């Protein structure tokens, strides 16, 4: 096996494939990258057994400066391969596998030898034989993920909550996530495949998969999504991302969302984010990481304290106030992340009482649940 390629192109593709590789894997060969050389191009593969990324580098694309002398396959240690290729002196490299699986990498006057493993020993990626292909615009998909990923749980006790629940039906994509302390929902329009008209698809995609996918796709690219019983495949041009789906029936979260309120405020999201970040300086030093929001017709106060450090109190500027006076306590990190998910928009926050979850929606779409964040308050003495 032997090929020559433009080094900078190879580095970029190696970096993307390495996103799927975990140093904590219990399967030694999965710490490596599989390189398969065909007559028409090269396939790079990385996997942690949950996520797999495969990239095809075509010989026909002249920008790759790819020439193939001999076909074959090899698995090379991911970390060393990446470090070596990044440091090579010239923007052209040659990689050659010898009979004993010794791999020689040459660039300019530099020569590296790496021990490899036969490509045939690398696990085979799943076959995705899907009835339908869903096309998702990259910019829209990234907004959906960025809005919902914040409520994905990092606790493996409830694996289902470590992902985002997707419902594709009725010409729309609905994405929901919750860690039982907060909830995020985003609904966007979707052109359904002809063969899926009148049908609904519900899947649970791991949060890690979605995070890596947003790093691979550009705003102006489309994502093709194909689903089987327990696998999903995302295709972006020459990049293929395979992922296992999370098993289980996601709970009905619609019942948690209501437009009812006793207190409603409208705020500049960015201004409130900055105020919360100032309060975080002290709240992060306390045992419970709690801040309190006090609302009335006269004023709005955000406060927090650490018994060891001190106290912070800031008067807020509201765009509008409606309803009853209220004092409510909550995790400030949750509010900061929720507000950030709306970008620069003004946000409407609805409160029922100090012990009831409160809901954030954009002011321009406040009476719909197309873009929602829900936060559960923290009970404090007096609440």
Report residues per predicted region:
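Structural preference for solvent-exposed beta-strand-turn elements
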Residues: 1-383
């Amino acid at each position: 096996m032997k090929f020559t390629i433009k080094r900078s192109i190879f580095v970029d593709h190696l970096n993307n494939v390495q996103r799927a590789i975990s140093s904590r894997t219990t399967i030694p060969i999965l710490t490596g990258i599989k390189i398969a050389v065909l007559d028409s191009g090269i396939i790079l593969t990385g996997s942690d057994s949950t996520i797999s990324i495969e990239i095809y580098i075509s010989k026909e694309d002249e920008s790759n400066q790819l020439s193939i002398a001999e076909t074959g396959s090899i698995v090379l240690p991911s970390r060393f391969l990446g470090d070596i290729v990044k440091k090579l002196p010239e923007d052209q490299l040659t990689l050659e596998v010898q009979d004993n699986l010794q791999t020689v990498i040459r660039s300019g006057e530099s020569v590296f030898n790496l021990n490899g493993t036969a490509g045939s020993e690398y696990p085979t990626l799943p076959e995705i034989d899907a009835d339908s292909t869903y096309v998702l615009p990259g910019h829209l998909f990234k907004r959906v993920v960025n809005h919902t990923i914040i409520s994905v749980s990092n606790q493996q006790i409830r694996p289902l909550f470590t992902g985002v629940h997707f419902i594709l039906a009725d010409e729309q994509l609905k994405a929901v996530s919750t860690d039982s302390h907060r909830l995020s929902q985003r609904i966007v329009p979707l052109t359904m495949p002809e063969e899926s008209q009148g049908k609904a698809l519900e899947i649970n995609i791991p949060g890690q998969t979605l995070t890596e996918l947003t790093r691979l796709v550009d705003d102006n690219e489309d994502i093709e999504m194909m689903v089987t019983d327990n696998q999903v495949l995302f295709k972006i041009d020459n990049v293929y991302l395979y992922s296992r789906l999370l098993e289980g029936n996601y709970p009905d979260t619609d019942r948690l969302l209501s437009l009812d309120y006793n207190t409603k405020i409208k705020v500049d999201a960015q201004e409130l984010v900055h105020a919360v970040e100032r309060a975080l300086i002290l709240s992060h030093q306390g045992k419970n990481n709690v801040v309190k929001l006090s609302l009335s017709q006269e004023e709005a106060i955000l406060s927090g304290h650490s018994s060891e450090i001190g106290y912070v109190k800031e008067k807020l500027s509201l765009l509008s106030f409606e309803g009853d006076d209220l004092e409510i306590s909550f995790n400030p990190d949750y509010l900061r992340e929720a507000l950030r998910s709306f970008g620069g928009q003004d946000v409407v926050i609805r409160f029922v009482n100090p012990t009831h979850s409160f809901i954030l929606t954009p002011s321009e779409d406040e009476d719909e649940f197309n873009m929602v964040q829900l936060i559960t308050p923290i009970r404090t003495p007096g609440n």
